[in-house]
UniProtKB/Swiss-Prot annotation:
GO terms for biological process: L-histidine biosynthetic process. It comes from Haemophilus influenzae (strain PittEE). This is Histidine biosynthesis bifunctional protein HisB. The active site is at D8 (nucleophile), D10 (proton donor). It comes from the Bacteria.
Length: 362
């Protein structure tokens, strides 16, 4: 069985026009940024299959010839750069036709399933829509949701290849596993500080899962987080205890801190301005400055943002300063998690062999 990437076409490999959502002319054909370099990096490890919904293909509203011309040029362009696709699987039906082959249904991939043609543990669906995520779930494999800003092709390749980003290779890989069980939560956290990859995060709080993924993605490491908490009450215990377990796991994985950079500072500028300063000092402290207008973002209470970072800092024994300004609460919270991830990436990087302290101990 071969590791396979089942890749969406419109909005993932090529730009999808927001006017009519059809690529029916050469003028509309535009590759997504960095898709060719990423696929070239991935092709030695994965087979590529395109899986695409094309609403009304072959009808007067979307003639087959209008589809074929830009599609064939796209395929020729990929092939000219050394990228080939084993198959191109297309559902031509509209949603109201209720067919069996339209994503997220799996009829298009029936032969892959019946003949065991893909490695379930090492195959992925890559796409920009929720239907792609549901397709992966129906196939029993993992998914990566493409987004040109938040999860672009560079990051996808980094995740799938699990590239070493923080360790020069002269030390054993830095790994830790923490299991934390209380009457309120049952948590398992695993962190691999010296490899990037696909993170498996399930806490039952969707927005929180996304924020934790931001830490690992921008921190350049891989982690798994599984949490079963008393969400019938609220998400407080889940967020707090996950922070405590994650902080403990990071502390254990970092080890005695010999050779690490220790400090990190980042000031990313987007529509929000987020500042983060971190010292893996062994002395826990936090200064947090953020104001939120909304009580919740999705299923996540905004007041828990500060509590998460406070619990994390004290569990890691780290000094942490966070500040954010902006107008959109979703973006402000996300920028804090991203900034922390980028700062942590600097602090855990191995630079030598010395203890980064005049005291000789941290």
């Amino acid at each position: 069985m071969q590791p396979t990437l089942f890749i969406d076409r419109d909005g993932t490999l090529i730009d999808e026009p927001k006017t009519d959502f059809q690529i029916d002319s050469l003028e509309k054909l535009k590759l997504e940024p960095k898709v060719i370099p990423a696929l070239l990096r991935l092709k030695a490890k994965y087979r590529f299959v395109i899986v695409s919904n094309q609403d009304g293909l072959g009808t007067d509203a979307f003639p087959q010839t209008n589809f074929d011309k830009p599609h064939n040029v796209m395929m020729a362009l990929f092939e000219s750069q050394g990228i080939t696709f084993d198959e191109v699987l297309i559902c031509p039906h509209k949603p109201e036709e209720n067919c069996l082959c339209r994503k997220p249904k799996i009829k298009l991939l029936d032969h892959y399933i019946r003949k065991n043609l893909f490695d379930i543990d090492r195959s992925f669906v890559i796409g920009d829509r929720e239907t792609d995520m549901q397709l992966a779930e129906n196939l029993g494999i993992r998914a990566i949701q493409y987004d040109p800003q938040k999860m672009n092709w560079d990051l996808i390749a980094e995740k799938l290849l699990g590239e070493t980003v923080t360790n020069c290779g002269k030390r054993p890989p830095r790994f830790a596993e923490v299991i934390r069980q209380t009457k309120e939560t049952d948590i398992k956290v695993q962190v691999w500080l010296d490899e990037a990859g696909v993170n498996e995060i399930k806490t039952g709080v969707g927005f929180f899962d996304h924020m934790l993924d931001q830490i690992a993605t921008h921190g350049g490491f891989r982690m798994n987080v599984q949490c079963k908490g008393d969400l019938w009450i609220d998400e407080h215990h889940t967020v707090e205890d996950t922070a405590l377990a994650l902080g403990q796991a990071l502390k254990q994985a970092i080890g005695d801190k010999r050779g690490i950079a220790r400090f990190g500072f980042v000031l990313p500028m987007d529509e929000c301005k987020a500042e983060c300063a971190l010292d893996l000092s062994g002395r826990p402290w936090i200064k947090f400055n953020a104001c939120f207008k909304r009580d919740k973002v999705g299923d996540f209470s905004t007041e828990l943002t500060e509590h998460f970072f406070q619990s994390l800092a004290f569990s890691m024994l780290a000094t942490l300063h966070l500040n954010v300004t902006g107008n959109n609460d979703h973006h402000k919270i996300e920028s804090l998690f991203k900034a922390f991830g980028r700062t942590l990436r600097q602090a855990i990087r191995i630079e030598g062999n010395e203890m980064p302290s005049s005291k000789g101990v941290l």
